[in-house]
Swiss-Prot record:
Keywords, alphabetical: Exonuclease, Hydrolase, Nuclease
GO biological process: rRNA 3'-end processing
A Pfam family the protein falls into: HD
Official protein name in the record: 3'-5' exoribonuclease YhaM
Enzyme type, top EC level: hydrolase
Similarity comment: family membership: Belongs to the YhaM family.
GO molecular function, one term: 3'-5'-RNA exonuclease activity
Domain HD intervals: 163-279
Stored Gene3D superfamilies: Hypothetical protein af1432, Nucleic acid-binding proteins
Gene name per UniProt: yhaM
EC number: 3.1.-.-
Role description: Shows a 3'-5' exoribonuclease activity.
Amino acid sequence: MEKRLLDFEVGETVELFLLIKSSIKGTASNGKPFLSLVLQDKSGELEAKLWDVKESDEVNYGVQQIVHLIGDIQNYRGRKQLKIRQIRQATPLDGVNASEFMETAPINKEEMADEITQYIFEMKNANLQRITRALLKKYQDDFYDYPAAMRHHHEFVSGLSFHVVSMLRLAKAVSDLYPTVNRDLLYAGVILHDLGKVIELSGPVSTTYTLEGNLIGHISIVVEEVSKIADELSIDDEEVVVLKHVLLSHHGKGEWGSPKPPLVREAEILHQIDLMDASINMMDKVLKHTKPGEFSERVFGLDNRSFYNPTFE
C-alpha cells in the first residue's frame, strides 16, 4: 500500500502530491520572506516552511493549490514537520484533483443523516423536537459537509456531523444509564451545539474563520438562531431558555468560550461528552501513527501532552 503523508517517520524522505491547506507569508530573522504551509492528504496534515520565497511563489503555493514535493520529515519541538527540498505546482498532466487529498468522515453523509433523524424522531418533547428539526433542515447541506473545527479535532470534510453522531451515541448511553437525564434536552443540545460552525467557518476546504466567526463566534450564533426559530414557531416556553443555556455553556468555562458555566444537569453532560469525543479524536489521530512502545508527537489541544501507545492489546 502506498504510504501517505503521516505514515512517514522522522528521518524519512517524502515524495508526494499534497494539497496546500493554508499558506501564510512571514519574514525570517535575516529579513527574507518565507511561507508557512500546512500540507495535507487523506491521512492528515503537516506544517512546512518554504524559505527565500519570491512574489511568484506566493501565487503558485497559495491555498488549495496541489503541489508535488520532495522533502524530509523532521522533529520540531516534539512534532513532525516537513522540510521542503523541491516543490512545484501540479499540472493537468499529473492527473490529480483536490478531492484525492481531503480527509473525510469514516461514515458517509447519508448514513449520518439517517442516524441523526432517528434520534430526532425519538424526542418526545414537541417544542425541543420542532426547534431541532427546523434548524437542522435550515442548514442541513452545510451541516453534513463542514468540519467541526479549523484545527485540532474533527477538522475534516463532514467532521461536524460525524462529531454529532458520535456524541449522540454517548448521549444515548448516558441517558440509558441515568434515567434522571432529560434525553430530549440532551439530544437537542448535542445536535445543535456546534451548528453555528456553518456560519463561523468558511467551508470544508481550506477552512478559515468568517467575519461572523471572528466577531461573534459559533456559540452566540447558534443561540441567536434558536431565538429566531422559536419566534417563527411561536414557542416561548421554558424549553427555549433552558436549551439556550445548554448551548451557551457547552464549553464549560468562561476562559474556554462559554459566558455561563453549566447550571443544568444536561448542560454539564453535554460539556463532558463534547470534551470526551474531541479528546478521543485528537488522541486517535496521533496514536494511529505511533508505533507500540513509543510516545506520540505532542498534541497542542490536549495541553501539549505526548501519549504512549502500549505494546499489548
